[in-house]
Amino acid sequence: MELSATVLIIALTVLTSYLAWQKPNLMERWMFTPYQIQKKNQWDRFILSGFIHKDGTHLLFNMFTFYFFGRVVESFLMIKFGQTVGIGMYLLFYVGAIVIADIPTYFKHQSHSYYRALGASGGVAATVFGSIILMPLSDICLFGLLCLPGFALGVLFLIYSLVQSKKGGDGINHDAHLYGALFGIAFILIVSPQSALNFVDQIKSFRLF
């Protein structure tokens, strides 16, 4: 595994998740709890909650996904802006996605003392969709069985997240997935408007068979 900002983020997330598993008081303090943020001004929860996970399965799924898609976005930003600036922008991209993806959830649940969330969903969704804008025709395979071009899976994912967000009740913060994805798309298009034209050109060239 090549050392990169993506790998360092994964290593940090594994470490902080492990610490939270070992110390329940840390887990409780770092979780995204809008009520506590509003009541005690614990704004650091916006970031800290993105670096802890519920269990090993949750951590493995998020970091496995992040590793493959994060490298695409990281490489793109380094090529476009140079190594130092590119890495800085990549870190801003990832942390910014975690924070911004949770803002709608904060306003929705700031009066609900029972609500808690954790995980890197916003950051991971942003890297997945940032990668899709850059490489929309690259196949994404689900469980090694069903493979779809990135843009097609992206559309399905956005529809699913929107529907489930309105429905609620499954314990998953679908808002973070949805807004993280939108942040990833917007970020890439802002720093590289040409990516929009490249995306359209690639979609036009798509052939089902």
Model-derived regions: residue spans:
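A detector for small-residue-rich transmembrane helices and their helix-helix packing motifs
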Residues: 1-209
